[in-house]
């Protein structure tokens, strides 16, 4: 691993070794030019040797004098080289802002309605941007913006004449990405572990296009119109970009012929190459009121987007459960923060995130995730410490507490409580009350009452009574109302020296009636044994309730002792401790007792969505009366003839017998915990990486720019705690603080959904890229290097270093290999179609309007393209072979296989650079 951590440094030494070797050969050729064959007519000495005559740059002028002494030349080389490195750092930092804006843009969401298999619908949010489309468009543009813009600026800045720097940088960068980056990713995986590409169809499409892109370059340079790029060739090259994106999207969505490929396929077992399909076949989803992609598999309708949402929820629930088991002493807020950091660390991340993370860790800006976790912890702590004082309220609120009362018919009177809350309790307050008929009538069931409640200074509540009239008639429970009105406060008396004007300027104590200002009194008949019932026929409970309590009411009488049996009955929810604990027993209602409670334990399964039911059933009530009523209702008395007096007494006894009421069976529906569900939803929103990498204000950006933070590694710990910055962090921070402060002026990503930052960043990248192109050209001509060699050796390396670190982090942290190597092929294709296609289209159109042709030298570029294409076939073949069962995936595997693959890829890159350099200096015959 130590070699790996020094990989960029090692690669740099290899570069300098190659440069030294080339310069040495160039010197030998200059001294012994007579030993070589005379160049052909189409190949003069100037084209074979690096020109020492520097040309005017797009932005930078020529450094005069043009023929300096050896000492001045060395000084110029050092200045140009240091300036190149510093400009590469600047481009990396502004590209950090650029990629952050892309992450915010591609993270935009919209609401969709998803149909579940049971026909129900639910509303959720999905990303507007398809992952494959964003990777091939904005993500590829973000990671390859310097190469693409360099090609365009070089052509436009030099009078629409083709140059070697831009195209050679694109090809050289493609070689570095394909061989060095993939080689590093293969090696960094721990021994015995593997990573394989998940979206294999998309990888095949982008890999095919990346190889085709360079074959196409050779065709237009050496076959269709050698040395000339026609308008149609440039436009067609540019047009291949949307075609590539479209086909990759089709493969990702399984459209066209892909929709018939429902099953998993594998090749002949003797060959051993396993090709897997990812995910399930997309089903119906209703989006914006219309059904889209409604394909069916096995008769089930399960939307792909819905499945992805469910998977993310299940993963979040699993994380919360695991953390709760590991840290039972933590409260919910602490668990949420830990789960947030864990989910952010382990979720699949975009290419943009890894690029941003790599740049910030290189420049002393710290680990994004740990900084985010620390900020969230500080925010939570500060919120818990801040207590907002409620504004003083001069108005006293007067109301009933409670607002519902129950009493037996023989109670004599019922007491009602009036409460005042808030305001100045040192004042005397008055409030009137009056009874109103409901189903109970004044004079027959209760005594009409009205009056005034006086709350003296310091009193916050007061009681008053209403008389209840008793009778011996069986009747239903009845109710009446008591209403409050005309609340007022005793007026302030004028003190000595106080005028009415001064008194009016003071905040007067006020009083208002608050809800509930009407109380309901229910009179329970005491002449009947009672009707026993639940309050309703259905009740919804949260699975996190623990023990649910259900009331059984005794209405229309409460005379005597009654036993009511009860038991739980299974529905879709199962008893025996699986979903609830089986419960059964008897409730004993004593004389005048009107309410009993049944308790049932609910098992908390911590599910995001849950809806299961069971029932609680009441049995026939048993009257424990031992008087004449029980005797007349006994079977022995029923068999003999009764007298008229006994018949009347039996009829009255039958009327007073306890019975079941309207709701003898209660359905209990167990639902998900609303608190748990909201916690999961909140966590899913908080794990949006756009919130982590994005910025909300210029203040945040400037504070971040001047703050040095520790880099660290995700794999070091899972706590999310920040470490102290190292010496390297401080050095890199002070080296790059100028760029950080300068680029803090870029609009925050929150503005215009990231588009403002996107536009400003790409303009700055274009300007810096133009300067890099001039510096690289002047550096090359100062030491006698051709632009094509400078591009392959220096510029391609400088623009690819952040991608190297990003891919290494992605390979280690992601479960799949898509983010680390899957984007390499797509990025290589996009570089050609956008970088070269756009530049050559503009130049070809310009010269066509002038009535001339756009000339491009086919020699060096065609040779480099051909060489890269051959080596790319070898690289892709090896990656495909590594999917064999005994290796398991493109990355990692047994140590011996890892080393062999890595050395093969590094060797391919070294050979590419060597052959391209030798061809550029005519040691190898090109095309």
Curated annotation (Swiss-Prot):
Ca(2+) 3 binds at residues 409, 471, 473, 475, 525, 527. Ca(2+) 4 binds at residues 445, 471, 475, 478. It is found in: Cell membrane; Perikaryon; Cell projection, Dendrite; Cell projection, Dendritic spine. Residues 386-485, 519-619 form the Calx-beta domain. One of its GO terms (molecular function) is calcium:monoatomic cation antiporter activity. Residues 95-147, 191-202, 252-726, 776-778, 850-860, 925-927 are cytoplasmic. Ca(2+) 5 binds at residues 543, 607, 672. GO terms for cellular component: anchoring junction; axon; axon terminus; cell projection; centrosome; cytosol; dendrite; dendritic spine. This is Sodium/calcium exchanger 3. The gene is Slc8a3.
